[in-house]
Amino acid sequence: MSSANIPATQSALIFEKYGGPLEVRQVSVPQPQENELLVKIEYSGICHSDLHTWEGDFEYASICPLIGGHEGAGTVVTIGSKVKGWNIGDRAGIKLINANCLNCEYCKTGHEPLCDHIQNYGIDRHGTFQEYLTIRDIDAIKVSNDTNLAAAAPVLCGGVTAYKSLKATNVKPGQIVVLTGAGGGLGSFGIQYAKAMGMRVVAVDHISKEDHCRNLGAEWFVDAFDTPDIVAHIRKLTNGGAHGVVSFAAAKKPMEYALEYVRKRGTVVFVGLPKDGTIPLDTLSLICNEITVKGSIVGSRMDVDEAIDFITRGIVHVPIELVKLEDVPSVYQRMKDGKVTSRVVVDFSMR
């Protein structure tokens, strides 16, 4: 079943080789299988992982040529013959991870991103930097009519990644969490989700992002580049160390520092992806202080629903910058320069 006026071709942003030119081209509109939806993409968030993919950091897992993007939101325009629970006109979200098996121990326990059978939009299959995309009905996320669709798009990866990583810290209301890279796209989500969850936030980033972080709700701000002995400073600021740390910064030093200023029995969660992520570990300190170290990547269907609900209810308000599909290369450069302080979203109605 299809709505009217679906074109044969569409605009898509493609690269032929890692680090190569990013070009908007005309490609065929995909046809959905019997258990798939065809979604007209209205918005697609631009994630730091898209930059990593284009640069070849995920070459071991990605395909090339590739249409990137994995934070899509739009409207269902075609449904396959065996699709259940969806109608034409429904609003749908497309998240990074799809095609998980639903039968392994990870899928059955709510840890779908760890399934060995997953595929990733914008990495090993064409993603959301195109006007139309197919997705299995069970992988699509329902987005209510009460939700701002442009705001929902970046939640499908960036927002849920920040939200789930904060849950992983086990920081309780009233306790302190430190967020490194707090002024970037993930950190901007992180500050607001942390506040909504009752945490007290120490934001760590370049001094130019202090006002931005404080406006989002950070109680304290620490200059990541010019603070003498940042470890001692944060330990003093937090009266003995943070209860939890989420390292959004895509650099090794913040990860190393986090292990030093987290308090005894605290939890450090690594999210940011530095190019060379190998760091030294003081195992004696980890053992004697009972420090927990975790990695965290995106979230389950339930995590996504919960993260979007904060947006729908107006509790989380992360600034969004709307751009054209042709602007993605310049956004990547700004990401590399550390000059992104909001979630940047492609608006497909902009030409």
Swiss-Prot record:
Protein name: Alcohol dehydrogenase 2
CDD domains: CAD3
Organism in which the protein naturally occurs: Caenorhabditis elegans
Top EC category: oxidoreductase
Cofactor note (record): Binds 2 Zn(2+) ions per subunit.
Keywords: Metal-binding, NAD, Oxidoreductase, Zinc
Catalysis: reaction(s): a primary alcohol + NAD(+) = an aldehyde + NADH + H(+); a secondary alcohol + NAD(+) = a ketone + NADH + H(+)
Protein family membership: Belongs to the zinc-containing alcohol dehydrogenase family.
A Pfam family it matches: ADH_zinc_N
GO molecular function: alcohol dehydrogenase (NAD+) activity; zinc ion binding
Sequence positions that bind Zn(2+) 1: C47, H70, C157
